[in-house]
Amino acid sequence: MAVFVANESGANDVDEVRLTALARFVLDAMKVNPLAELSVMLVEEKAMADLHVRYMGEEGPTDVLSFAQDDAFDASWSESVDDDPTTLLGDVVLCPDVARRQAEQAGHSHERELHLLCTHGILHLLGYDHAEPDEEREMWKIQNKLLASWDTAVKAAGGKRPAGGADGADGAGEPGPTAAR
């Protein structure tokens, strides 16, 4: 699974390696086709506010936006692969400054908030939504379970920063945590 993280926010307190590992972990736990690609972009507040107005019609910056590349894309893993085995799942855009404020309000770390938002954005790309109360309950339940599994995997790895994704395949020689299924 290819996960690309680009930090264009100017925030120097974002652990991009760990964010990449988390995204791979979530994709693996959700049984997304291992040939899918995901990009995660971290942007400044102004850029996020511009995206928020342009695509959601709402003023001001938000914490996370998701942009699916192909609404018809079946993200589930399959034994059969089309002629083009690589499919773009989509983009998750995060705003570290908004996440920082939300983390302070929630009483947890900035990194924890970014992990929550990245997981949330990925779930949107996989078709989850929270427009209705029952959808919201389901999405939050899955989101919380994924984050708890991530925490358990990180603790099992001795608290080390996971260098790899759920499969540990990043070429760094340090395995990442394995997704709980």
Swiss-Prot record:
Q: Does the keyword Transferase apply?
A: no
One family name in Pfam for this protein: YbeY
Q: Which gene encodes it?
A: ybeY
Q: What does this protein do?
A: Single strand-specific metallo-endoribonuclease involved in late-stage 70S ribosome quality control and in maturation of the 3' terminus of the 16S rRNA.
Protein source organism: Frankia alni (strain DSM 45986 / CECT 9034 / ACN14a)
Biased region (Gly residues) positions are: 161-174
Q: What is this protein called?
A: Endoribonuclease YbeY
Identify the cofactor(s). Answer: Zn(2+)
GO cellular component terms, alphabetically, are:
cytoplasm
